[in-house]
């Protein structure tokens, strides 16, 4: 991160500079701190023929929350640089892929609508190409430099979904329904389901989304810890 933008208290800002990490591979996977692998996983889950595996499916966006307003900022940039008709004409099989199931219903309904809307993003590990970040910066440098002055989160921010959507609109992805083996558990309302899913390894990837309002936080934390210890009894090299 350029020194003139420090100190930073805005994770969105840090994320738009991910490609600057020294020795970062062209193919990389971005994990937030609440994402966990709980089952066997191979690189093919994230990449095929050198391209990220992802779902290209629209979702509704009310713009009521700050996060949704940020997603709308992303889409305004996408519509500035991509022609939806041309993208769909070139890649209709990627957007209307049967593997998406009912999650692609808006794709069919909006097939002839001229503009992109917000894409679905499962709250879990996201595969990227470093060259995608470089391409976005090349084309949107002014907007991203302006955002770099936002030391704290702002309604005018962009998010990593900008890079995911750019990647998809550039046809740099392989269709894959990422919902089939991932699950997000808000621990405030689904702590028991989360503990059970970890212990039974019901998914490949889970997001354990916590917050300060979780009831019986200490007990929930302890039960999750026991579930992880049951499936991962040996310490990794990292922990030794």
Feature names for model-found ranges:
Residues 1-26:
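Active-site-proximal specificity loops/subdomain of glycosyltransferases
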Residues 36-40, 45-48, 104-105, 172-175, ...:
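Short catalytic/ligand-binding loop motif for oxyanion handling, primarily in non-cytosolic enzymes
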Residues 52-148:
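Long, charge-rich alpha-helical interaction segments
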């Amino acid at each position: 991160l350029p020194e003139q933008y420090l100190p930073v208290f805005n994770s969105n800002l840090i994320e738009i500079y991910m490609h600057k990490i020294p020795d970062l591979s062209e193919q990389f996977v971005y994990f937030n701190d609440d994402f966990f692998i709980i089952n066997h996983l191979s690189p093919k889950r994230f990449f095929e023929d050198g391209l990220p595996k992802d779902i290209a499916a629209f979702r509704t966006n009310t713009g009521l929350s700050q996060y949704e307003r940020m997603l709308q900022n992303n889409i305004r940039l996408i519509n500035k640089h991509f022609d939806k008709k041309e993208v769909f004409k070139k890649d209709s099989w990627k957007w209307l892929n049967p593997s998406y199931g009912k999650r692609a219903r808006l794709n069919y309904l909006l097939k002839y609508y001229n503009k992109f809307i917000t894409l679905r993003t499962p709250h879990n590990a996201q595969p990227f190409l470093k060259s995608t970040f470089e391409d976005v910066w090349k084309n949107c440098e002014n907007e991203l430099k302006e955002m770099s002055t936002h030391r704290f989160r702002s309604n005018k921010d962009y998010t990593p979904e900008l890079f995911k959507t750019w990647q998809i609109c550039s046809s740099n992805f392989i269709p894959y329904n990422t919902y089939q083996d991932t699950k997000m558990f808000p621990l405030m309302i689904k702590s028991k389901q989360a503990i059970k899913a970890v212990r039974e390894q019901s998914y490949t990837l889970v997001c354990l989304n916590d917050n300060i309002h979780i009831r019986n936080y200490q007990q929930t934390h302890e039960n999750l810890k026991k579930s992880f210890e049951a499936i991962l009894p040996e310490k990794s090299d990292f922990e030794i």
